[in-house]
Amino acid sequence: MYYPNTHDNMIVMTKMDIALNITLHNEGDLLYKTFQSIALNVKALKEEYPKLKVQANVSLDCPDDYTKQFFAKSKHFLVEVVDELRYYTVDFADLSQSRNYLINKALSSKVKYIQIYDGDDLFSIKYLLRMHQLAIKAGKPVVIEPEFVLDMDEWSGLCRTGSIRKLLASNDPHQLATNMYANNLYQSQIFVSSSIFEKIKYTPGDGRYRYEDYHILIEMIASGYDISVAPSTMILYRRKLTGSLLTSSNSNCRLCLAPSRFFSPRVFSGLNHRNFEEMQELSAQLDAPVITNRQSEDNTDQYIKIYHSSIKNVLLYGKRLLIETVRSAKHIGRSRKNQKRLNTRELKELNLKRLSEAGFNQEMFDDIRQLNNIEPLATYDTAGFINLLPIYTAIQSSGLNDIYYRLCSLPDIDRTTDLLLIPHLTKGGADKAMVELCQALSEHNRSVLVIGTNAGDDNSWRDKLNKLPGVTFLERDDYFPVSQINDKDLEIMLLRVIQNWPKLEYLTVMNSGVGYNLINEWHDEIKRHVKIIVHDWCYGVNDCGLIFETTILSKVYRYIDCLVTDGDGYKKQLMKIHGWDGRKITPIALPINPVNLKQDYVIKHHIMYAGRFSAQKRLDLVLTSHRELAKRGIQLDIYGSVDKADRLYDGRDIRWVEQIDNARYQGPFNGFNELPIDQVDLLILPTQYEGLPNIVLEALKANLFVIAGKCGSLPEVIEDGKNGFLVDDNGNAEAYLEAILKFYDRSDQLLSPDERKKFNQKILHEHDRAIYQKHIGEVYGW
């Protein structure tokens, strides 16, 4: 028998039937037990099929000395049973590459099937035989999983097992392939036709991806292969607490699942699917003999009780202490005292029937007894212990599956070129900017998916969005309800959209916390697939400090391709505060909707506030001066509605209005042209922070005088004494009062209406839809 200890590309592989590919890393003495178990698998196979040629391929990927030592001591178990053993020391430090390396070696030997093994688990005796028999019976390329999984750990044997997991085939009437969206229903050690591995390989992690075994299974499903289950097979799966590549990968939250065709709209929507409620009803039919969806909680007295903590690991078997690692007899006594006494005989009879009906037969009990000779799995009557465990079926339906299936099933959704994330629809300028962007994208034949990542209210923008060709708007409440999908799960779903939707080119984020977190968490992966555009308009600060969008922008700025804003003022502010060179910041003036010109300029001693009621818009700064305004006979008319999403807004100023004689709340308004501009002398906009508010642009275009706080990009469009006044101390009520009184005291010295109109036309000429679309096209590539 020939077995090289290093890889050699010149080796000519001999023809084999089955390859056993075993990946080793830092298993140490655990592989000593695993090799014995695999040897039993080969013996059982060869007793039934003596002419089969079996090859074992072993990779030692960056092994530690302890693993090398035990490989040398353990390889004889394989040498005695296989026809060929080949082992290779490699330095991938990546499970996917180790697996692919061995797969290529096996394919060189023209094998028909490849069994993937890990180096620290145990297997039922006829595991390999049952896999091969099912493959022959299928008569087509196969992917086969074991039927049962028992969990154990590296120190405590089976005491970590709380149940037996029963796997179902992906085409089983009680299982769905779409359930693989939210959970991996299977395990890593699969029996696969070599023809499948010729087409599909493991995706290398490369420090970017994790869950390679989950990934290859969904790739196989996407390619049309069912996942089968071999009856009467069992794996005792060892969950190592430390030192494994899986543990290392799972602890790195920056790693994600690699792209897969499984998540593309066309493939996923083409899979057989039932919704969560239907799956719940269907799975309930499996409660005899197996348990699904935590049904056993209703029958807790019928099953074994398991307790884990940092100081004890106690498993009670009837009245007897089956496994204990408690140092203190006190703890043992207390644990036993608190448990309900169980009738062991009744439990055995009850559960033995369940096990038998579920396919866990006498052969498997015999296998467990043999495996107990390799590794003591429990200190007392292992088979009796197994007999008391409930069997859970790994269906794991989830509302997340429904949401993604519904999303992928939308008409023409696979044509999406632009993903746009907003918080929710409001009547503010940010959403007008969003609608303008969607309109520009729509007119250039882009396909846009707009997702509101926060719950919102009814809004007039909704109808306009839904009428734009190629634009699909999905609201959080309707499509992504918080009761079914939290923000983190929504981020992961959006990441899968970005990774796998075939025509997606741009991710655009406008004030969406989910969107910002998505970029911050997964920027490396996102940038491999799309360009990242952020639209932001002001440096937000309130009484609690910087607002979230302002804070996180400084984190994600390095990852984005472009920051679009509406004025040079904000660009200069960001460059000054952060030291950014500004090359990624692109000011683009937003177009102004047509408005009615002011016709009546006779002084009426009426001023107007129009906008949202929020912590940002400081209406209280004007109301503070109501007595002084009343002395001059100045009336304040207030238009707008409460921003319900603003948690800092307490509504105090609106309640205050009811107590003031010279202030009147006139209700909400739907568009600037609903405002009675001929009945007022000016628009006042007290504000804590601002960009270039749409209400100001529309007021200037209508030739209405404007008083506003000096912040953001407002100095670009308002010039003192010509078309308005800027309040330098924008958080000072007296400063706003002085500006109002100055207007009335100097009204005869201000520009005439015609002069003001010409001035406004000059400074607003960039706020044109054609110019806007030209500049947006430069950002979005047309």
How does the language model describe each region?
Residues M1-T14, C256, R261, P265, ...:
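Non-catalytic membrane-proximal stalk/linker segments that position and tether the catalytic domains
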Residues L60-C62, I451-D457, Q635-G651, Y665:
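Glycosyltransferase donor-sugar binding loop
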Residues L129-R160:
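Conserved donor NDP-sugar-binding/catalytic core segment of glycosyltransferases
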Residues D29, D431-E436, S614-E628:
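A conserved mid-protein helix/loop that constitutes part of the nucleotide-sugar donor-binding site
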Residues R208-I216:
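Acidic donor-binding loop at a coil-to-helix junction in glycosyltransferase catalytic cores
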Residues F705-A708, I718:
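Short hydrophobic beta-strand element within catalytic cores of glycosyltransferases
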